[in-house]
Amino acid sequence: IDGRYYWDGGLVSNTPLSQVFDAQPRRDSLVFQVDLWNARGDLPQNLLDVAEREKEIQYSSRTRTITDMQRLGQHYRRLLRELLEEIPEDVRSSNPWCRRAGELACDNRYSLIHLIYRDRARFGHFKDYQFGRVAMREHWQSGLADIGRALAHPEWLQLPTGENAFVTHDATA
């Protein structure tokens, strides 16, 4: 476009969770993750099914991986905060490594509600670029039903308590 090149950011990540969780300053967060690709699917019966399933696996595995990495990262940040509490304050304030560790450590809490789009089989392997009127209306109706299922669990909207500072709720399970 006008001499500039563009590409689909979905090739890197359809859900930019890293940017949400890594934003500074870190804050307790309620996050709705909309995943347009289903990690669970039927065994392909033909080559068209294989192409569709390949995309589902390719795109959905990244969102799960990113979620798992963020959960682990928050666990380590919390552990680091707890370890720093064992170091005397005068050492923490004067030691550059302790100061840097203090910048990284946090005790924030995250509740992630995962909405997984369960699509109609008829969109096939081209569903990543299917934006026709019928397809979009079905997507919107499905999304409305998914968010309704999520909101039927008001406890999911609360931040986690106790040792587990990062929880994930699957609204389409």
Walk through the language-model features, giving the residues of each.
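Non-catalytic peripheral regions of patatin-like phospholipases
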Residues: 2-6, 10-173
